[in-house]
Swiss-Prot record:
It comes from Pongo abelii (Sumatran orangutan). Component of the eIF2 complex that functions in the early steps of protein synthesis by forming a ternary complex with GTP and initiator tRNA. This complex binds to a 40S ribosomal subunit, followed by mRNA binding to form the 43S pre-initiation complex (43S PIC). Junction of the 60S ribosomal subunit to form the 80S initiation complex is preceded by hydrolysis of the GTP bound to eIF2 and release of an eIF2-GDP binary complex. In order for eIF2 to recycle and catalyze another round of initiation, the GDP bound to eIF2 must exchange with GTP by way of a reaction catalyzed by eIF2B. Its main location: cytoplasm. Residues 13-22 have a biased composition (Basic residues). This is Eukaryotic translation initiation factor 2 subunit 2. PANTHER family: EUKARYOTIC TRANSLATION INITIATION FACTOR, EUKARYOTIC TRANSLATION INITIATION FACTOR 2 SUBUNIT 2. The gene is EIF2S2. Gene3D superfamilies: 3.30.30.170. The modification Phosphothreonine is found at T31, T36, T111.
Length: 333
């Protein structure tokens, strides 16, 4: 019974725990227990060994669990520390890089602007010193030239040594460009409308066409158009009948009666061709012209540019228009 009392004695277990707590760190419980325990353990040798073995196993398991927990904690702490060290390392590098950049910029900033300012100031000073007087002279000359041009525009007077063309007073031949300039200058002098750039349009009343019966058409305002064009009715009548390929006459109401059915557009086209050939000038396109007949030929004389050119004679009778038909067929194909 003394052995059982020793096994279940709570004081002994407490003492054993207190004795073995400092040995947990050294992990040498077996050797130290044999040295530290006195003669009390020698009295009960067989039975307490089993209890000690059980307690030692329990303590070993506890130590292993504690060591595993410590290892896990150390592992996590190492990981956390590594992460922290990495972050700190990155921040330090960034700060060092920023400091380096700041140092470089501080070193470079005072040098470059000073050089640039020195260069710019030097150039400006040189320009001001060297170009002061020529600039003023050029400005004065430009102002005087502008004033002279304004006076020329107002007065219309130009001063020049040339009294005639460029080749006058010399033995050289004139050039093609000089002749062209002379021609255009004369045209501008004679026709001031061309200088302004306004193209004069010829306005004419539209022809009034009325059907008479089933086989005839009446050109009502024939005489009015002849007066607008300043042409004789006989000449315009001959051209109309030749172009339309019909016969007709003027009745008592001064209306042109034509055989056949014709529309207003057809007569307008004929009148356009007549105006282009026998009314407008071929050089300046002015309608102020006079049609004259000389030795079986008609001549068109312009009153604005005073040019004179021949006009085609009116051909009467049947004429084959094979050329026009061939052109139309070629275009269609």
């Amino acid at each position: 019974m003394s052995g059982d009392e020793m096994i279940f004695d709570p004081t002994m277990s407490k003492k054993k725990k207190k004795k073995k707590k400092p040995f947990m760190l050294d992990e040498e419980g077996d050797t130290q227990t044999e040295e530290t325990q006195p003669s009390e353990t020698k009295e009960v040798e067989p039975e307490p060994t089993e209890d000690k073995d059980l307690e030692a196993d329990e303590e070993d398991t506890r130590k292993k669990d504690a060591s595993d927990d410590l290892d896990d904690l150390n592992f996590f702490n190492q990981k956390k520390k590594k992460k922290k060290t990495k972050k700190i390392f990155d921040i330090d590098e960034a700060e060092e890089g920023v400091k380096d950049l700041k140092i470089e910029s501080d070193v470079q900033e005072p040098t470059e602007p000073e050089d640039d300012l020195d260069i710019m100031l030097g150039n400006k000073k040189k320009k001001k010193k060297n170009v002061k007087f020529p600039d003023e002279d050029e400005i004065l000359e430009k102002d005087e030239a502008l004033e002279d041009e304004d006076n020329k525009k107002d007065d219309g007077i130009s001063f020049s040594n040339q009294t005639g063309p460029a080749w006058a007073g010399s033995e050289r031949d004139y050039t093609y460009e000089e002749l062209l300039n002379r021609v255009f200058n004369i045209m501008r002098e004679k026709n001031p409308d061309m200088v302004a750039g306004e193209k004069r349009k010829f306005v004419m009343k539209p022809p009034q066409v009325v059907r008479v019966g089933t086989k005839k058409t009446s050109f009502v305002n024939f005489t009015d158009i002849c007066k607008l064009l300043h042409r004789q009715p006989k000449h315009l009548l001959a051209f109309l009948l030749a172009e339309l390929g019909t016969s007709g006459s003027i009745d008592g109401n001064n209306q042109l009666v034509i055989k056949g059915r014709f529309q207003q557009k057809q007569i307008e086209n004929v009148l356009r061709r007549y105006i282009k050939e026998y009314v407008t000038c071929h050089t300046c396109r002015s309608p102020d012209t006079i049609l004259q007949k000389d030795t079986r030929l008609y001549f068109l004389q312009c009153e604005t540019c005073h040019s004179r050119c021949s006009a085609a004679s009116i051909k009467t009778g049947f004429q084959a228009v094979t050329g026009k038909r061939a052109q139309l067929r070629a275009k269609a194909n």
